[in-house]
């Protein structure tokens, strides 16, 4: 059976991921007029720029949907976001600033939950607004087929008939008006925005040019921290984790993870925390550029990693970072539920996150400028008395350290011999300007 349909399947049910914007509105109306039977599915992901979710399915019915459903995905989205924090599943960083994979997390949830809802309605053909140059077309393809093995894909934006008739936003707007809908195009921004309650992505148009900076962006989850006229007073905030799970902010305990994330967004957003500018590698190996917001994710991530470094040993922390980066790439590629990702997630959540219990106090200032004021945990292996510079009882003596250093002589001797070997083969210079300026002299002395 053909998985991807190049032309509209007339007379068949088609599920469309319906946002209520111009593109999906025009596509739904066009499909209905051409003889398909469209079903509209809207994901409530807690998008910060969406004012009225209930109105979206109503509009879909007006445009010809056979049925329209609003699927609440917020709880699952936050659960996956917390899992990503527990695992450090983030691989794109620039200058220490992290992209928290908020769009890939949203696609993992949307791609599974919407297709599951379609399957309940007997809808086995799915369309969405992703373009052939982006990451989402592959993410949705993978998640959709994982959820429904019988799924077929129809995307109007891959159909030459649709493109020939309604290939641009102006044409789509004129089409809607001609069909009796007073649809006015929104004012064109200098970039495109996609969001969910974990974060916002700003990209394309002017942001494709690297001489356009964050300063052209109007944040939807935070503030223009780069604008000195914007007053942002410093603020202290405490974050508490129990067994890897964020449970309290500023002493207030949350039983609802969605409400906790919304509050974390409000706190971090007041300062512009978690905003970053990234050049990344898309799934198809081409580079793209995005400016991201994720105030709540950033706040929780900072506190989580502070506890992590105080609780776990060096090798565990190294594995957390290495496996987290690997898992972040899998998430980015639309493989969040693949076996290799589940294996990494289980290991990191079981052996790392389970021990992360404690409270971190931070002072937030402007943007990503913050200080850690206090760290408290019953699981801390950081114990200042072990390495205090003050006189007192010690867990080891000067003689113990002398013995430990003496044992290092073996590998120091081996390293010296390797350096001589590198010099003899020309891989390493023995001149005074090299990294080991005394090597030639030592060799002459027979040492």
From Swiss-Prot:
Gene3D superfamilies: 1.10.287.400, Argininosuccinate synthetase, chain A, domain 2, HUPs
EC number assigned by the record: 6.3.4.5
Origin superkingdom: Bacteria
CC annotations in GO: cytoplasm
Residues where ATP binds: 17-25, 43, 129, 131, 136, 194
GO biological process terms held by the UniProt record: argininosuccinate metabolic process; L-arginine biosynthetic process; urea cycle
Keywords: Amino-acid biosynthesis, Arginine biosynthesis, ATP-binding, Cytoplasm, Ligase, Nucleotide-binding
Positions that bind L-aspartate: 131, 135-136
Pfam families noted in UniProt: Arginosuc_syn_C, Arginosuc_synth
Catalytic activity of the protein: L-citrulline + L-aspartate + ATP = 2-(N(omega)-L-arginino)succinate + AMP + diphosphate + H(+)
Keyword Ligase in annotation: yes
Oligomeric form and interacting partners: Homotetramer.
Family note: Belongs to the argininosuccinate synthase family. Type 2 subfamily.
Annotated protein name in UniProt: Argininosuccinate synthase
Native source organism of the sequence: Escherichia coli O157:H7
Taxonomic lineage: Bacteria, Pseudomonadati, Pseudomonadota, Gammaproteobacteria, Enterobacterales
